Amino acid sequence: MASGRWASPGPAWASRRPLQAQVVLKSASPGPAPASQQASSFGSAPAQLPPAFVDPELSPAMLLSPTCLPVACTGPGLAGEQPLQAPLLPPRGISRPSSGLTAASRDQVPACLPAACVRPSSSVTVACSGPTHASGTLSRGVSPCLTLASLTLREFSVGPCLTLASLTLREVSMSPCLTLVSLTLRAILPHAGLLRPSSCLCWPFQAQPLPVGGL
């Protein structure tokens, strides 16, 4: 009898086994979380996202973007400080009073007046070594910005080439930028050995104006 009971547990034991299995399943998988926990978990999800995706208007990428671009990144058109190029003089070598040649510091413009090979029938382009050098020869303590308001060019030709004879300085205005109303340089090029009757004249011209006190 006893051995028969242990061999066949009976219907009572068979009915208890599913109940124990259900209890084990309940303890292993607690089921869906409460609504409050779901809300808190979903509410905290945006806080864990990167700051750029939380709010586009307040993202660091928008806040750190510069409202004004640097001069080096922008082009000369946007920066407003584009280096001015020296305009060519008329073919006859006489400039108009309204034409001005402006140059700033050496960092902005490499040469205030570029040099060129001068011919009688072509336009004349005067050059100098740099704005700081030109302003240093004129006066001490003057800003390196050099503005040429008007140039008076007098030329004569020796053989096939043009010789720059004189460039006269008449008025000098001492301001933060040195303004030359009209500049005249009296340079005798054959004296320096730079001019030959049979060769074209090409030289890096350096302006050496007259002293201010002597005018």
Swiss-Prot record:
Residues 25-48 are annotated as: Disordered. Residues 27-47 have a biased composition (Low complexity). This is Putative uncharacterized protein FLJ46235. Pfam families: DUF4705. It comes from the Eukaryota. InterPro entries: DUF4705.
